[in-house]
Amino acid sequence: MRRIFITAIGGDIGYGVVKSLKKSNHDIYIIGCDIKKYNCSYDLVDEFYLSPAYMKEDEWWKFVLGLVVSREIDYLWPVTEPEIRIVNKRKEELHNVKVIINNPLVLEIAMDKGKTAEYLEKAGVPTPHTWWKSEDGPKKYPLIVK
């Protein structure tokens, strides 16, 4: 049986990951964590842990490493963008645990709206015109500002 540790299971993405894995035919044991005990995935996981917030990076990482060791985790699946950044930066500390995240190049592009727009444009994917705050933007509406 493979042991999978999923972070941020209380959010929509975490819930989707947990629910999809539960529906699979894989022999897995799911351990989940979230900053809130009462959440949409609490009853779906085999074990639940209340986690510190990722904003306290060292505290959050110590919590993750502790669970990885004590619960003999095979796979770590960080869900939120900030948690993915932390795990990507420190994944060598996990030794033999497999981390379920994209490769560093994909993360660099996908986690930056400007780089994503440039990448898609170069690839020929139709995208809305993108302006950076240092440029003069459109003078007509409607428009989306992010």
Residue locations for each model-derived region?
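Active-site nucleotide/adenylate-binding loops and adjacent lid/helix of ATP-dependent enzymes
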Residues: 107-146
